[in-house]
Every structure is written in structure tokens, then in C-alpha cells.
Amino acid sequence: MSLVPIVVEQTNRGERSYDIFSRLLKDRIVFLGEEINDTTASLVIAQLLFLEAEDPDKDIWLYINSPGGSITAGFAIYDTMQYIKPDVVTLCVGMAASMAAFLLAAGAKGKRFALPNSEIMIHQPLGGMQGQATDIKIHAERILKLRDKLDKILAENTGQPIEKIKADTERDFFMDAEDAKAYGIIDEVLIRNKR
């Protein structure tokens, strides 16, 4: 069971209560705080599209605390971030691992942040398959293509050579916030709120 806090605001027309995520959305904050799957991606994408419709010229903040997850769901979020007009500011609060680190690096250049005690981890895609040898081969070839695509985009977003990305993602590669800044995944470690 997931508990979602409710906040109450006083207005000149009385009280209004919101779940906390709806209240954050009013401030153009989208919170990705769980594993990335199709459901999570649909929710994040819907919020990004809604905020673009509300004001296409105002930045959207994507707060990330996620262990990563599905590559295809992550690509759906990534493509939407690139598609919409507003800049998407990314901020790691806690952990951005795997696909979540990929999304962190995909924020607007100069607007990718992490809090001081955040942890970022990149690695190659994970997959599992059982079945006939031909099917296993098809899936293995697919995951290798996905790895190449992820590595290419991560190299573009970080400024690292593709060979370094491939070597570093061979196994789990952990970074603290300062390391992630030096690597090019983020642009700045935030101590105080920039908003």
C-alpha cells in the first residue's frame, strides 16, 4: 500500500486539498520516484505533455530518485523530453541508476543537477530470455543494438568518447554527485534550491 500525503491550501475561496504530486505539478515539478516501467512512463509523459500545454516556454523540473528499469519505457520518457518545447531540468535526489541515470543526463544542457549525497550508476542493459535458440539469438541481437543506441546517446549527452562509455558501462559504474559532474552526466551539484 502506497501512502500519498495530502496538502491543504487556503485560498480566498476557502480550502483546497491536493495529493502532494498534484501540488508539485502546479509548480511544474514531475517526480520520478520508482522503477521505470510502462505505467510510470505513461504517468511521466502525461505530466510532461500537460505542462507543455500549460506553458510551452517555462521549464519543467524532473526530480529523479529511481533504480532505473525498462529500456523501452525509459526511451518513451527520453523521446518526450526531447520532443516537447520546454526545457526539462533534471535533478537527482537520492539515486539515479541505469535508465534513470540516462534520463538524468538527457536534461537540458546546463540544467542537469544532483543534490550533494546523490548516487548515479550507469551500466549496460540487462536482459533475460529463455526459449528456442533462434529466439534467444534474436533477443541477444536486439539487446546489443539497444546498448549501442544507449551508449551513443549517453556519449552525446556527456561529451565522453563512445569507447569510454562502452568500457565504463561494461559493469556497474557508480559515481557520487561530484564524479557525475566531472563525467558530464550533470552540470552542477546543488546545495540550495535554484528555483
Swiss-Prot record:
Reactions accelerated catalytically: Hydrolysis of proteins to small peptides in the presence of ATP and magnesium. alpha-casein is the usual test substrate. In the absence of ATP, only oligopeptides shorter than five residues are hydrolyzed (such as succinyl-Leu-Tyr-|-NHMec, and Leu-Tyr-Leu-|-Tyr-Trp, in which cleavage of the -Tyr-|-Leu- and -Tyr-|-Trp bonds also occurs)
Coiled coil feature spans: none
Gene3D superfamilies: 2-enoyl-CoA Hydratase, Chain A, domain 1
E.C. number: 3.4.21.92
GO terms for cellular component: cytoplasm; endopeptidase Clp complex
InterPro entries in the record: ClpP (IPR001907), ClpP/crotonase-like_dom_sf (IPR029045), ClpP/TepA (IPR023562), ClpP_His_AS (IPR033135), ClpP_Ser_AS (IPR018215)
Positions annotated as active site in the UniProt record: S98, H123
Molecular function in Gene Ontology: ATP-dependent peptidase activity; ATPase binding; serine-type endopeptidase activity
Keywords per UniProt: Cytoplasm, Hydrolase, Protease, Serine protease
Keyword hit for Protease: yes
Locations listed in the record: Cytoplasm
BP GO terms, sorted: protein quality control for misfolded or incompletely synthesized proteins
Pfam families linked to this entry: CLP_protease (PF00574)
UniProt subunit comment: Fourteen ClpP subunits assemble into 2 heptameric rings which stack back to back to give a disk-like structure with a central cavity, resembling the structure of eukaryotic proteasomes.
Family per record: Belongs to the peptidase S14 family.
Known role: Cleaves peptides in various proteins in a process that requires ATP hydrolysis. Has a chymotrypsin-like activity. Plays a major role in the degradation of misfolded proteins.
Entry protein name: ATP-dependent Clp protease proteolytic subunit
